[in-house]
């Protein structure tokens, strides 16, 4: 069975590892290298980095767009039985979809959270379950027929890092099952009426106010990798805990200072801030930050 794989981040890498163990992967498509960080160091995608580090001898393609005759010819020459897609970052044009069955491993229980950030949105909304859907791709955005899915619980301690890890391994196990039993699967159409969509995360999405502790906690979990959570003045809250979600407090009032951190009240609930990072400075313990600002219990945290 000849497989072409399309994927970019570490979620995709885990799925690719599973394919390499059981199938003939004849080509890998991933996004172009791009500048990363303040110094704008040109960095390869996680999938490419993995293949190079493991000395895997498979052709790697990094087109800026799939809508070209060159890409079509490359895929046609590879003659795949299946094209497996996981967080690739581009929509496949009709011509490619017609080359071979294209199966997408989407990190949500479709039709919920179609789009670019399903894991973050499951956390943002405080969901208690999520999963991976294997979908037969069409020209829409995550609208294809469902081939299979698997479900896991979301723990309150989960964040984007842990959930990405769990779902990538779930997808790694699901993908071979779908490929091996593809001819016997009856695809199920998605119910569009139940669909929801999630956009790419923007930096400004990480800004918070001390209004609802549960909302802050869910943002912290969802944005722990990027963009983080921060106040209007740019102060990043690097590490926090949820204290309680029921009591009413003055917004941003410092309720308690201890070695464990700084408890700050919200209009609903409270959080414990353990460490912060002022703009253009290194991260520090929240208690040390308060000392520098000469803030005490009863003051407003800023």
From Swiss-Prot:
Gene3D superfamilies: 3.40.50.12230
This protein's UniProt keywords: Protein biosynthesis, Transferase
Keyword Transferase: yes
Source species, domain of life: Bacteria
Cysteine pairings via disulfide bonds: none
EC number: 2.1.2.9
UniProt-annotated binding residues for (6S)-5,6,7,8-tetrahydrofolate: 108-111
SUPFAM superfamilies named in the record: FMT C-terminal domain-like, Formyltransferase
Family the UniProt entry places it in: Belongs to the Fmt family.
Official protein name in the record: Methionyl-tRNA formyltransferase
Organism: Nitratiruptor sp. (strain SB155-2)
């Amino acid at each position: 069975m000849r497989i072409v794989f399309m994927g970019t981040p570490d979620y995709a890498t885990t799925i690719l590892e599973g394919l390499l163990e059981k199938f003939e992967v004849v080509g890998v498509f991933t996004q172009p290298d791009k500048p990363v960080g303040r110094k704008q160091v040109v960095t390869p995608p996680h999938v490419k980095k993995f293949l190079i580090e493991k000395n895997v001898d498979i052709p790697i393609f990094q087109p800026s767009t799939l809508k070209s005759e060159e890409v079509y010819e490359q895929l046609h020459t590879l003659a795949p039985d299946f094209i497996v897609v996981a967080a690739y970052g581009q929509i496949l044009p009709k011509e490619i979809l017609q080359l071979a069955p294209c199966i997408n491993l989407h990190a949500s229980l479709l039709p919920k959270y179609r789009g670019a950030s399903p894991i973050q949105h499951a956390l943002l909304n405080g969901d208690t379950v999520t999963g991976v859907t294997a979908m037969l791709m069409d020209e829409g955005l995550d609208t294809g027929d469902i081939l299979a899915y698997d479900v896991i619980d979301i723990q309150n301690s989960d964040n984007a890092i842990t959930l990405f890890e769990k779902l990538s391994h779930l997808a790694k196990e699901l993908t071979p099952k779908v490929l091996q039993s593809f001819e016997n699967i009856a695809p199920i159409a998605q119910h569009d009426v139940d669909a929801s969509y999630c956009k790419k995360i923007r930096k400004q999405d990480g800004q918070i106010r001390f209004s609802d502790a549960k909302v802050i906690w869910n943002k912290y979990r969802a944005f722990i990798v990027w963009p983080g959570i921060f106040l209007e003045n740019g102060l990043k809250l690097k590490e926090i805990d949820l204290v309680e979600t029921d009591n009413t407090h003055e917004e941003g009032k410092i309720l308690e200072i201890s070695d464990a951190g700084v408890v700050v009240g919200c209009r609903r609930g409270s959080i414990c801030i353990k460490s912060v990072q002022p703009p253009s400075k290194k991260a520090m313990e929240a208690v040390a930050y308060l000392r520098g600002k000469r803030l005490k219990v009863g003051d407003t945290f800023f």
